[in-house]
């Protein structure tokens, strides 16, 4: 029997998809501003990971968590940083 594995079963009722979408929406302003070379790289890798490898945004955020945290701290974006940290604690 071939049953698809849901690696997020432990996140039931944690709204990991909604939280991931909200963090990505907040990060979009940084991507659009392009004030750091990382943002262009991150946007490109997100597209590649989503489309070519089938990874969702939670996984993309997890892959870049230390860098995202550092850049958000440096930029003073405490709101997005708090959202990212909540996502990490509840869903990663």
From Swiss-Prot:
The organism's place on the tree of life at top rank: Bacteria
The keyword S-adenosyl-L-methionine is assigned to this record: no
GO terms classed as biological process: nitrogen fixation
Alphabetically ordered keywords of this record: Nitrogen fixation
Role description: Is required to sustain N(2)-dependent growth in the presence of low levels of carbon monoxide (CO). Probably acts by protecting the N(2) fixation ability of the nitrogenase complex, which is inactivated in the presence of CO.
Family under the similarity heading: Belongs to the CowN family.
Protein name from the UniProt record: N(2)-fixation sustaining protein CowN
């Amino acid at each position: 029997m071939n049953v698809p594995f849901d690696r997020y079963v432990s996140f039931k009722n944690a709204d990991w998809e909604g939280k991931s979408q909200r963090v990505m929406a907040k990060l979009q302003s940084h991507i659009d501003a392009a004030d750091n070379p990382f943002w262009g790289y991150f946007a490109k890798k997100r597209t590649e990971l989503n489309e070519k490898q089938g990874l969702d945004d939670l996984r993309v955020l997890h892959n870049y968590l230390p860098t995202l945290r550092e850049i958000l701290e440096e930029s003073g974006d405490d709101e997005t940083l708090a959202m990212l940290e909540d996502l990490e604690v509840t869903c990663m």
